[in-house]
């Protein structure tokens, strides 16, 4: 603690001092509200709504509203908010992050700001990490909200559009970050406004905010359709990768990448029968080889992914859960499928995408809760404008956190851990053991079996039994091995007689690269003032120590002449570990910041497209816009074709008319001879007059009302098609940006500049295609209004955790020979699919 903090207190304590008078005000209503009947208490909700309608603010009514929610909670749930929970609730209402330790009742805390903000009628979203927790919290807390006259909904994976709309229209809606994000994307792909499900994004409370806004920040949400690329080349590239020897490639563990050596490049040129592997023409080969190398030499089975039912499934590195339905992007998933010799799925095409960073920044007010946020305080402030307030615990923490024990080898470390578990088991003290991978869990499990220690294993392979196992983990004599405990969401309550033997003992088998994940594991013990104990066991062979800890530490151990059996506990070692973790956290922050800088370019473009889509959906007449598009397309065509040279005048006019005949102009309506005596401006006028006259005739033929609907459907269809292609193009542009840094060019600035040019090209393409389709479309008078309820496949789990790979949902693909959904009556391939 610095001198400033010693004198003035920490930032959190200074901020909490400002909140205490509001807490005292809330307390002052207690006796009065206890005397109210249930009906009188319930009527307070309507009174508050009236006060807001008459100009009062949420802050004006906060003390009284919190007091009402507190009294209602005591009556309905049998739980009365402590003063610390009131502080947490105020911090959330202020749009900040409440850091509250495990077992301090975060779910109950959220009811206070949720109730207050729901009174405005604009909706409150409570985000949890999985469907199970969303349903559990909604079921429990809807009793309280219902008592106070508010409605509660929950968004889970298998709801249809009608059920989703109903849930979003409730006063308070629970759900996962994935579901909310996907619904936002789908709402911006609909053709009719009635198909949208979300309201405007108002106030959001994110539970486990560090997991969602930090761990998953590198994870774009992607809605995808099937691409056209063949999968055969993945098998060829995999075969090549498997023929390589160790000196044909180098593995960079820090960046998790593999590159061919000179010798490897020679082998590639020979294998693929090419002269120069680095040639731009061979980018396709390079891409497949890079992914095959990564799949074979950095991606580990049962650590990064599992093969289950002949399918490759990603394992979440933060929670150890299986992430069914998610796929690695950029062909890596297909490369792993080739490596494991399972069916290779086709690459997909991105239809819509957004990062969590940009989704959550759209809320008018954002807040969050977690047990561990302080280590990432700078990132919360810089990226989201959120500050972290540490809320004091209701009872003092009685857990003992022992210093780390360091062994020379991993083998010696695990032997010591097993001995420690066996000793603890003898006195019937429950033990929770945290591991970093499924592989390590199973190794430890085998060692404990040989030692005769009964235990439970909790990891991705068995997560169906998860809640059941966790509910018993605090009972006498229980030994539970768990892959990373982040986001488990279930408290471990101590069984009878456990306090007497020292509470829950937590053993970490390795330091995670994030201090926060270590703190989460520690925090499982010692909840609500319970006794407890935690300790981490580390070896110099652990990934974190091997890759990031300094060589100096290795030197110290050598000098001490430690044998495999010896262990050291020292401040220097603990500092070295913490510095290694800070180094990794810094690297990860830089990566997330870089992702955001690139995504901000896409985000500005996305906002323009989605805003215009929204205006079209809201039924604003497009007639003037379409006429402006017609004028713009014709003017630009004339400017592009007319060189101003007399000797090429006739040729210029012939090319101009041929070009416009493709778009709208019937043959022989106007001739080169008629136009060659006119100025460019007069030519524009003649051609625009013809177009406007033709358009008026088409409108009369189908009725103005029907024409407005056709304009809307066609414009949306073309915008969507062009936007999807633009997303792909921007993705390719971004992949090429790494080379710009070598040319002394700022890659982000280059991406911004070129991306802006590509966006302008896309807008011009939208105008031209819209005009072209509107002139060419043949409309059947009685054609039924198009319904485009886009269905996504349901192969995605509730999406916990934070893989750094895109989360994808799949869209149904329109067949080339199906009728075009735009209502033209033509086959898709001859209409919008051209």
From Swiss-Prot:
Question: Binding positions for ATP?
Answer: 85, 103-107, 491
Molecular-function GO terms, alphabetical: ATP binding; metal ion binding; protein-exporting ATPase activity
SUPFAM superfamilies, from UniProt?
Helical scaffold and wing domains of SecA (SSF81886), P-loop containing nucleoside triphosphate hydrolases (SSF52540), Pre-protein crosslinking domain of SecA (SSF81767)
Q: Where in the cell is it found?
A: Cell membrane; Cytoplasm
Q: Which GO terms describe its biological process?
A: intracellular protein transmembrane transport; protein import; protein targeting; protein transport by the Sec complex
What InterPro entries does the database record attribute to this sequence? Helicase_ATP-bd, Helicase_C-like, P-loop_NTPase, SEC_C_motif, SecA, SecA_CS, SecA_DEAD, SecA_motor_DEAD
Any one annotated GO CC term: plasma membrane
Q: Which reaction does it catalyse?
A: ATP + H2O + cellular proteinSide 1 = ADP + phosphate + cellular proteinSide 2
Q: How is the cofactor bound?
A: May bind 1 zinc ion per subunit.
Its membrane topology: Peripheral membrane protein
Concerning CDD domains, the annotation shows:
DEXDc_SecA, SF2_C_secA
Question: From which domain of life does this come?
Answer: Bacteria
Task: Name the job this protein performs.
Answer: Part of the Sec protein translocase complex. Interacts with the SecYEG preprotein conducting channel. Has a central role in coupling the hydrolysis of ATP to the transfer of proteins into and across the cell membrane, serving as an ATP-driven molecular motor driving the stepwise translocation of polypeptide chains across the membrane.
What is the annotated quaternary arrangement, including any partners? Answer: Monomer and homodimer. Part of the essential Sec protein translocation apparatus which comprises SecA, SecYEG and auxiliary proteins SecDF. Other proteins may also be involved.
HAMAP family in the record: SecA (MF_01382)
Protein name from the UniProt record: Protein translocase subunit SecA
Q: Which organism is it from?
A: Clostridium novyi (strain NT)
Upper taxonomic lineage: Bacteria, Bacillati, Bacillota, Clostridia, Eubacteriales
Q: Which gene encodes it?
A: secA
């Amino acid at each position: 603690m610095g001198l400033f903090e010693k004198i003035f207190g920490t930032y959190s304590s200074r901020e909490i001092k400002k909140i205490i008078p509001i807490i005292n005000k809330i307390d002052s209503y207690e006796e009065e509200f206890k005397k109210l009947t249930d009906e009188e208490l319930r009527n307070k909700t309507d009174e508050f709504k009236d006060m807001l309608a008459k100009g009062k603010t949420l802050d004006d009514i906060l003390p009284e509203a919190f007091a009402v929610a507190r009294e209602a909670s005591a009556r309905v749930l049998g739980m009365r908010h402590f003063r610390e929970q009131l502080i947490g609730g105020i911090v959330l209402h202020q749009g900040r992050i409440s850091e509250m330790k495990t077992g301090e009742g975060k779910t109950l805390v959220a009811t206070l700001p949720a109730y207050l903000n729901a009174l405005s009628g604009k909706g409150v979203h409570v985000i949890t990490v999985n469907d199970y927790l969303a349903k559990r919290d909604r079921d429990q807390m809807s009793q309280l909200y219902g008592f106070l006259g508010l409605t509660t909904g929950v968004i889970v994976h298998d709801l249809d559009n009608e059920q989703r709309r109903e849930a979003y229209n409730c006063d308070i809606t629970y759900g996962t970050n994935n579901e909310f994000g996907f619904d936002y994307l789908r709402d911006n792909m609909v053709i009719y406004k009635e198909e949208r499900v979300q309201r405007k994004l108002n106030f959001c409370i994110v539970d486990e905010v560090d997991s969602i806004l930090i761990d998953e920040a590198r994870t774009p949400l992607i809605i995808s359709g099937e691409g056209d690329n063949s999968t055969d080349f993945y098998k060829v590239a995999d075969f090549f990768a498997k023929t390589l020897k160790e000196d044909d490639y180098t593995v960079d563990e820090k960046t998790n990448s593999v590159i061919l050596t000179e010798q490897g490049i020679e082998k590639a040129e020979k294998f693929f029968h090419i002269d120069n592997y680095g040639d731009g023409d061979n980018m396709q080969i390079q891409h497949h080889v890079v992914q095959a190398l990564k799949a074979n030499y950095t991606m580990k089975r049962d650590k990064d992914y599992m093969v289950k039912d002949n399918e490759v499934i990603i394992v979440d590195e933060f929670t150890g859960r299986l992430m069914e339905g998610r796929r690695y992007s950029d062909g890596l998933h297909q490369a792993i499928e080739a490596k494991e010799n399972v069916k290779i799925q086709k690459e997909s095409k991105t239809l819509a995408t957004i990062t969590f960073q940009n989704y959550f920044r759209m809320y008018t007010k954002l807040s969050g809760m977690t047990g561990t946020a302080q280590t990432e305080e700078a990132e919360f402030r810089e990226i989201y404008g959120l500050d972290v307030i540490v809320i004091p615990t209701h009872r003092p923490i009685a857990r003992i956190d022992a210093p780390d024990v360091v062994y020379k080898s991993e083998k010696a470390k695990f032997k010591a851990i097993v001995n420690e578990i066996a000793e603890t088991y003898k006195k019937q003290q429950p033990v929770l053991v945290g591991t970093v991978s499924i592989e390590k869990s199973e190794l430890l499990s085998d060692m404990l079996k040989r030692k005769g220690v009964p235990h439970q294993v909790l990891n991705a392979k068995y997560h169906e039994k998860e809640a059941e196992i966790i509910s018993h983990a605090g009972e006498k004599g229980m030994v539970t091995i768990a892959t990373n405990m982040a986001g488990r969401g279930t408290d471990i309550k101590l069984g009878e007689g456990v306090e007497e033997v020292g509470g829950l003992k937590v053993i970490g088998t390795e330091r995670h690269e994030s201090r926060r994940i270590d703190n989460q594991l520690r925090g499982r013990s010692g909840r609500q003032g319970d006794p407890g104990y935690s300790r981490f066991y580390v070896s110099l062979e652990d990934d974190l120590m091997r890759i990031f800890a300094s060589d100096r530490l290795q030197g110290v151990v050598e000098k001490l002449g430690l044998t495999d059996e010896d262990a050291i506990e020292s401040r220097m070692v603990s500092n070295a570990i913490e510095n290694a973790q800070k180094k990794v956290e810094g690297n990860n922050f830089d990566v997330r910041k870089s992702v955001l800088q690139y995504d901000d370019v896409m985000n500005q473009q996305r906002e323009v497209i989605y805003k215009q889509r929204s205006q079209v959906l809201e039924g604003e007449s497009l007639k003037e816009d379409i006429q402006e598009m017609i004028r713009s397309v014709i003017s630009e065509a004339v400017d592009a074709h007319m060189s101003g040279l007399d000797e090429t005048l006739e040729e210029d006019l012939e090319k101009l008319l041929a070009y416009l005949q493709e778009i709208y102009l019937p043959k022989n309506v106007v001739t080169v001879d008629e136009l060659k005596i006119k100025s460019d401006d007069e030519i524009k006028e003649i051609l625009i007059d013809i177009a406007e006259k033709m358009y008026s005739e088409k409108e009369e033929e189908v009725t103005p009302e029907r024409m407005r609907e056709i304009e809307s459907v066609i414009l949306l269809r073309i915008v969507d098609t062009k936007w999807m292609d633009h997303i792909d193009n921007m993705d390719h542009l971004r992949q090429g940006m790494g080379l710009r840094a070598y040319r002394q060019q700022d890659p982000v600035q280059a991406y911004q500049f070129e991306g802006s040019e590509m966006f302008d090209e896309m807008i011009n393409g939208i105008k031209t295609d819209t005009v072209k389709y509107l002139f060419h479309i043949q409309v059947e008078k009685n054609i039924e209004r198009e319904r485009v309820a886009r269905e996504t496949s349901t192969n995605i789990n509730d999406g916990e955790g934070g893989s750094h790979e895109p989360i994808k949902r799949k869209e149904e693909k329109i067949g080339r020979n199906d009728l075009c959904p735009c209502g033209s009556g033509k086959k898709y391939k001859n209409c919008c699919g051209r």
